[in-house]
């Protein structure tokens, strides 16, 4: 691990243990903050993992669908899931499974932070479709 401007980043493909608070975090107005546990030159080839911290109204992404499976676990707070055109409230410990091409977005709905763990399968050359 190496210290970057915004926290720790992995520098090689070996194993590591790190506290999420020490990782490099990115933030965009309206999208909250997140860390992917990856670095600029290190990318997990098989599975993407991200920890997202959402404020009220922050969207994790655009309303979209992925070619591969995505799963989400709300660790704290509350969120609104929009999935296949339907709304569903989420709370701590709710798990969301999105098979391939399931349109979805998660939006923070708490007065305090909503923390969501996201895990997605990866295949080379695979992207997502946004609407």
Task: Give the positions of each predicted feature.
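A short, N-terminal "cap"/entry segment at the start of jelly-roll beta-barrel domains
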Residues: 1-46, 129-131
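Double-stranded beta-helix
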Residues: 3-4, 105-131
């Amino acid at each position: 691990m190496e210290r970057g401007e915004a926290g720790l980043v992995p520098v090689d493909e070996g194993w590591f243990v790190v506290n999420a608070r020490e990782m490099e975090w990115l933030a965009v107005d309206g999208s909250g903050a997140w860390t992917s546990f990856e670095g600029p030159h290190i990318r997990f080839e098989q599975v993407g993992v991200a920890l997202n911290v959402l404020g009220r109204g922050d969207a994790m992404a655009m309303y979209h669908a992925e070619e591969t499976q995505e799963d989400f676990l709300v660790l704290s707070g509350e969120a609104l899931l929009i999935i296949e055109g339907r709304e569903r409230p989420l709370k701590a410990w709710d798990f969301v499974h999105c098979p391939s091409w399931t349109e979805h977005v998660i939006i923070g709905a708490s007065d305090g932070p909503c923390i969501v763990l996201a895990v997605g399968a990866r295949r080379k050359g695979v992207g997502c479709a946004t609407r």
